[in-house]
Amino acid sequence: VLKDPDGKYVMADDARFDPVFGALAKQGRTLVAHLGEPRNCWLPVDQMTVDGDRRYFAANPQYHGLLHPEIPNYEAQIAARDRMLERHPTLRVVGCHLGSLEYDVDELARRLDKYPNLAVDLSARIVHLQIQPRDKVQAFLVKYQDRILYGTDLQFGGRPDAADADPAKLLA
């Protein structure tokens, strides 16, 4: 989470980013952006929808947004992202982790319909699709297939040597 020199949280719609987003759009570049944690990050552990999130946030309370009211909440972060997309309609954006709308493909579809230059990847959130109605998810994937990218968010178990290691050996 980024703070400015005054200690204020910097959101995706901060005007200081406008020249960067404008330049990217003008050059036809794509912004790949992680713009928010999963909605589960802002729920009590016992209300989270997937086991992986329950385990992760229970073991890592420093990242559990609900426990940190000083951090802008989920709704504020998503709203800031949406305002940024509205201000930069020609900027191509890939929203990592299903655009942080992993909990509901209908909600994500509304954003994809509203923002034609928005695409999303599946990294680290595909499990959230598995708990939604199969037919609804299948229809969503078919309809938006040209705007959904496969992603892994692959980690190597927090191994400090992973960054310098031969990927083939790490995957063996």
Give the label of every model feature segment.
Residues 1-64, 116-119, 124-126, 134:
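Active-site gating/metal-coordination segments in enzymes
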Residues 11, 68-71:
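Charge-dense, low-complexity intrinsically disordered segments
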